[in-house]
């Protein structure tokens, strides 16, 4: 039977499953689609459909990611699931699949494991704002006290990484039992089967606990400048794609980065040779700026609402270093290494001042394939902020991907 198109009338939220290998992330993804399909809110996807995720490229890195979509009574969701641990690391750092929230899957039979910890840390570093927990494989735990113990362990772990461990919803269940119940009885309704109900309960928690994100157009205006040219008798035009917010003719904007911040007024906005009164997030526009000479503005600067972004030279970041097979370096690099950082629209030279491991110890050397916390310093100030993505390049090829976790100065 042909399915009608999803109506985009509900608020949209991006989520994903995270957690240790074999704890049931992909099985849960399949169980959510199977359960919501009972009410027509999804197309049921089998484990194999999700697991055979196609490769995609983001910032020069190949990542395997499966995307499914579904809806609850309140919302429309886009859900990402990655087959391998390395794919998660790359996905979260490149922001290839931006997550407004995550479902952390923990096996009730095993409790938190090393990748559970690593995914929570990564979520914190890359700015995944909210987590809901699914304690999977509950059917394998006979002792109620054991289940409570695992829940306590998960809450403590979340709190250790500055998530509100005491408040986060933790939903027990079994993804496999839910799928089997639906396979055995495809007309099962909510209230008929305890395992199916537990998947509904999880989605209720996701609906209630993960807030609807602010849309890009509701944020403050920012556009990275891609090109600059002069129009005789009219002034200087900066072109680029509006990253966020809305901008109107007559408004003041700041030109930030590279040199001292300048303020100017927008005298015109053009898109596809047509003049506009305002430009929105996602639009590729040319913005005419009053009293700015061609020499005062260049690619790599940003236009922004005054007072909303400042230029910085030093920052901490979470970085994934490409392997040789991914087209990265063949050899390690050390503190003091000076690559190019590709930030928004331009390459900036910077030097790496420190590498730090997850446990806080200082590391001297980084190998291809590593994920590391890195402090770096640009040779001139650039408009950066926490959560911003960048690539690390050497001679024009990408050798790493990173996300700013903290501004130093």
Swiss-Prot record:
Location(s) in or outside the cell: Plastid, Chloroplast
Annotated InterPro entries: EF-Tu_GTP-bd, EF-Tu_GTPase, EFTu-like_2, EFTU_2, G_TR_CS, P-loop_NTPase, Small_GTP-bd, T_Tr_GTP-bd_dom
Pfam family, one: GTP_EFTU_D3
Region (G1) location: 19-26
Region (G4): 136-139
Keywords noted in UniProt: Chloroplast, Elongation factor, GTP-binding, Hydrolase, Magnesium, Metal-binding, Nucleotide-binding, Plastid, Protein biosynthesis
GO cellular component: chloroplast; cytosol
Alphabetical list of Gene3D superfamilies matching this protein: P-loop containing nucleotide triphosphate hydrolases, Translation factors
Residues reported to bind Mg(2+): 26
Reactions it catalyzes: GTP + H2O = GDP + phosphate + H(+)
EC code(s) of this entry: 3.6.5.3
CDD domains found in the cross-reference section: EF_Tu, EFTU_II, EFTU_III
Domain of life: Eukaryota
G5, as annotated region: 174-176
Binding-site list for GTP: 19-26, 81-85, 136-139
Region G2, residue ranges: 60-64
GO molecular function, one term: GTPase activity
Ranges for region G3: 81-84
Domain tr-type G: residue ranges: 10-214
Similarity annotation: Belongs to the TRAFAC class translation factor GTPase superfamily. Classic translation factor GTPase family. EF-Tu/EF-1A subfamily.
NCBIfam families named among the record's database cross-references: EF-Tu (TIGR00485), PRK00049.1 (NF000766), PRK12735.1 (NF009372), PRK12736.1 (NF009373), small_GTP (TIGR00231)
HAMAP family, per database record: EF_Tu_B
Function: GTP hydrolase that promotes the GTP-dependent binding of aminoacyl-tRNA to the A-site of ribosomes during protein biosynthesis.
Protein name, per record: Elongation factor Tu, chloroplastic
Lineage of producing organism: Eukaryota, Sar, Stramenopiles, Ochrophyta, Bacillariophyta
